[in-house]
C-alpha cells in the first residue's frame, strides 16, 4: 500500500494543498494525529499538532510559537473524502472555526465566510447545514467542560 496522503481543501480561497510536511503519528478508523510546521510562515504560528476526528467532522489543532509556548487551540469544522486505492484523504475546511486561548477564552470565527460562500455559491446549503451541526456539537462539548477529553487524543502523541 502507498503512503497515506493528506490534502487540505479550502473554499475561501479556493485551493487544495498536499500536506507534504505533515507527519502522521497515529491513525485508526476514528482519528488521524499529525505533527507539522506552518505551511506559510507567520509571525506567531510556527508548528503544531492536529487530530482529525473523522466521525465527528472536526480537526483540533494545537498551535505553538517557535519557542514552544502554546499559542492557542484551533478547531476547524471539516468534511472529508477518502480514496482507499491511493490511501488519500481530502479534508475540506467548512469555514467555521473555534479558537480556544490558553486563558480559557473562546472565539467562534469565520461565520461571515460561511455566509459569503453560501451567497456566492462556493458552498452548498447542505454543507452549511452539516458545518453548523458539527459546530454546535463541538461547542456543546466545550461549554460543558468536556474539551479536555478531546485534547487527550492529541496530547498523548506530543513529544
Predicted regions and their residues:
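Charged phosphate-binding loop/patch that engages nucleotide di/tri-phosphates or the phosphate backbone
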Residues: 131-159
Amino acid at each position: 500500500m502507498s503512503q497515506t496522503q493528506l490534502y487540505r481543501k479550502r473554499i475561501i480561497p479556493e485551493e487544495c494543498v498536499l500536506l507534504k510536511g505533515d507527519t502522521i503519528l497515529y491513525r485508526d478508523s476514528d482519528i488521524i494525529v499529525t505533527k507539522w510546521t506552518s505551511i506559510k510562515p507567520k509571525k506567531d504560528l510556527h508548528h503544531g499538532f492536529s487530530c482529525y476526528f473523522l466521525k465527528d467532522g472536526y480537526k483540533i489543532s494545537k498551535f505553538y510559537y517557535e519557542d514552544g509556548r502554546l499559542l492557542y487551540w484551533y478547531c476547524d469544522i471539516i468534511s472529508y473524502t477518502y480514496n482507499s486505492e491511493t490511501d488519500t484523504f481530502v479534508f475540506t475546511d467548512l469555514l467555521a472555526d473555534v479558537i480556544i486561548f490558553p486563558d480559557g477564552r473562546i472565539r467562534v470565527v469565520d461565520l461571515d465566510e460561511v455566509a459569503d460562500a453560501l451567497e456566492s455559491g462556493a458552498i452548498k446549503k447542505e454543507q452549511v447545514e452539516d458545518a453548523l451541526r458539527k459546530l454546535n456539537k463541538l461547542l456543546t462539548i466545550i461549554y460543558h467542560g468536556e474539551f479536555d477529553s478531546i485534547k487527550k487524543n492529541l496530547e498523548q502523541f506530543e513529544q
